[in-house]
A protein has these predicted regions:
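Helix-termini ("caps") and immediately adjacent flexible loops/tails
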Residues: 2-117, 128-134, 148-165
Length: 165
């Protein structure tokens, strides 16, 4: 019988720290000329900078860095714009679900969309006695206005409570 006792090498894990992620996206901005990709990278940098400026505990920072590491942001994908857009949306959802942190205008956008949906129903059902297209148009406008106002109020509450990035 032959036993092999090779020394086990310790695999070092490179955790994506907030600083590393910020540097990565700064480099990606320099490498690309596509405006859509630059916008995604700048939004990532803005979120990372906001997180660095927040008073987060050490465990929260480690959790965020682990999530960033799980996303494999340093991989070379063929379609960078699509890959990082999905990563950005996943990261925003993670921050929303885990820490209740939202980006600026999150609720305005969400409630505006809901307002459009309900405005369409309202315009079709209630205002249809005017003229079909006029009723729908007025319903959409009213729904958008009401939804946007509600969303802005919710965004203001999130900002006051410190839940906005």
């Amino acid at each position: 019988m032959f036993f092999c006792f090779n020394t086990l090498t310790k695999k070092t894990l490179k955790i994506m720290t907030l600083k590393n992620v910020s540097d990565l996206f700064e480099n990606l901005i320099d490498e690309t000329s596509k405006k859509s990709e630059i916008k995604i990278y700048q939004e990532f940098i803005q979120i990372i900078t906001s997180l660095e400026n927040k008073d987060l505990s050490e465990n929260e920072i480690k959790s965020i860095e682990t999530e960033l590491d799980r996303m494999k942001l340093d991989s070379n994908s063929l379609n960078r714009g699509k890959y990082y857009k999905k990563a950005l949306n996943d990261f925003k959802n993670y921050l929303k679900e885990t820490y209740s942190l939202t980006t600026k205008g999150y609720y305005t956008q969400l409630y505006g969309g809901l307002g459009l949906s309900f405005g369409l129903l309202f315009g079709g059902a209630i205002l249809s006695n005017l003229e079909r297209s006029l009723g729908l148009s007025l319903g959409l406008i009213a729904g958008l206005v009401v939804g946007s106002i509600m969303g802005r109020n919710k965004d203001a509450q999130a900002k006051i409570s410190g839940k906005t990035l």
